[in-house]
Amino acid sequence: MVASLLCTVAVAVLAVAAVGGEAGVVEHTFVVHEMNVTHLCNTTKIFVVNGQLPGPTVDVTEGDTVVVHVVNKIPHGLTIHWHGVRQLRSCWADGAGFITECPIPPGSERTYRFNVTDQVGTLWWHAHVTCLRSTINGAFIIRPRDGKYPFPTPVKDVPIIIGEWWELDLVELDRRMRDGNFDDNPLSATINGKLGDLSNCSGIVEESFVLNVKHGESYLLRVINTAFFSEYYFKVAGHTFTVVGADGNYLTPFKTDMVTVAPGEAIDVLMVADAPPAHYHMIVLANQPPEPDPQIPEYISRGLVRYTSADANNNGLPVPMPIMPNQHNTMPSYYFHANLTGLMHPKHRRVPMHVDERIFIILGLGTICRGRKHTCKRQRSLETIELSTMNNVSFTHPYTTALLERYYDGTPEGVYTEDFPVRPPRPYNYTNPALIPPGPLEEVLEPTFKATKLKRFKYNTSVEIIFQSSTLLMSDSNPMHLHGYDVFLLAQGLGSFNAKRDIRKFNYHNPQLRNTILVPRGGWAAVRFITDNPGMWYLHCHFEFHIIMGMATAFIVEDGPTPETSLPPPPPEFKRCDAS
């Protein structure tokens, strides 16, 4: 059935221009359907695109127009988000469920159409309703128009998509988390949909991802973390990497033997096959904070780098394993991200030195009483439900309309307000370890409420945001993803942000441009950007349980003074919520 489906579903590429020529149109058809997959002795029904896990790679050249027809054959509504694509003046195609559009109903179709402008590198796409992105995802590759890279041209590029294998129904998982149940865990990490040979059931060993290489050649590994819960360490035994890009932007080349990638991030690394021809294991390993934070199982997957000239049995020798950090040691992630800088080139945008609006956002957790109670026993009792917060506000998603529609129509009443708090209600020691586990002090600091509070900006405003992770209830890192924008990551640090001390650390010369900003565990991150893309843009943590719990808001960017700086009307293929 899947084979016949793939034969009838044409993934067409129309008028794709030759390198250096005119921009073309890249067209795909995504058929979203159910598929049974057996892992660890159990068969699970999952949702996939075109019979593939991960889904098809969208491969375009800078300047192309992308057209994707999505056919929904599953019993749930869904949208497709083009993670990291700027969507300049095409906010209607962003694909954020109930933010820019209502979901595509079962049995219906929708077309996404947008241009890829001034971006080169690795992004990705994924479902953006409930937990469906676990299996509905794929790489989105943007190649330079002139065919030239600011690093040695690889012989091949390979997506390395890190994910997780869930046996639990993903819609049920979403429902359970919204009800405050966070005891469910995936069974394994995956590399390109494969669990790897460290997983087995009744002696049946799971299949591993295999990367075949030729000695002396270089490979561009496009490492993407699609997981729900964890940052991942990625290593290949006997090999080193040169990090050259992240989130669709070039980086100053940085040599390392390990990559750390948080949920939502895409990291480009060059790997030269310069080891003695043999077989070498690759490992992805999830990290997590140590106790007293709540603990999760060890998520790991093992793949293989196989030299084509090597003996099939590796000359009878054991296959080398990379030495991985302790999973409870999160500092390698901090140092990896802190060592990255942007590559200066003629098209690299300059950091805004003047700031019009400053925002200070505390990322934390809070509790509210269940049901309609006004008072209840707090501190993780059965009377409360835990929520993720930004400045003590937990975001409430609309489920019958889309925020962009209401903004465009000028009818926000009863749906959202524009009073998102730009600073926390009270200052405190945000990274005090005594706040873990919860006690009486948290009850004073974390009063929380649910609301749909947005922030409005005028066009061409220079914005600075300090994201501060807190230790309220636990000490997670927070990968914050802003739709529609790349932001300058000026600095990251540990502890509570202190402006007098920490502003001296800001990198104004060659900061990274990122769409997903990892705010360190017990630390902070400072970003700046110019509001030059009108529309409704979702800001949220990319840990699935954090977004479901409410660590989100949306930014409204007003129109500029000209049609070229304004949000156009919905395109003909756009389906309004009342017509979905």
Swiss-Prot record:
Catalysed reactions, semicolon-separated: 4 hydroquinone + O2 = 4 benzosemiquinone + 2 H2O
Leader sequence residues: 1-23
E.C. number: 1.10.3.2
Residue ranges of domain Plastocyanin-like in the record: 31-147, 156-310, 419-561
Cited Gene3D superfamilies: Cupredoxins - blue copper proteins
InterPro entries on file: Cu-oxidase-like_N (IPR011707), Cu-oxidase_2nd (IPR001117), Cu-oxidase_C (IPR011706), Cu-oxidase_fam (IPR045087), Cu_oxidase_CS (IPR033138), Cu_oxidase_Cu_BS (IPR002355), Cupredoxin (IPR008972), CuRO_1_LCC (IPR034288)
Cofactor stoichiometry and binding remark: Binds 4 Cu cations per monomer.
Location(s) in or outside the cell: Secreted, Extracellular space, Apoplast
The keyword Lipid metabolism is assigned to this record: no
Cofactors (names): Cu cation
Pfam families tied to this protein: Cu-oxidase, Cu-oxidase_2, Cu-oxidase_3
MF terms (GO), sorted A to Z: copper ion binding; hydroquinone:oxygen oxidoreductase activity
Function field: Lignin degradation and detoxification of lignin-derived products.
Family, per entry: Belongs to the multicopper oxidase family.
Protein name: Laccase-20
Organism: Oryza sativa subsp. indica (Rice)
Gene name of the encoded protein: LAC20
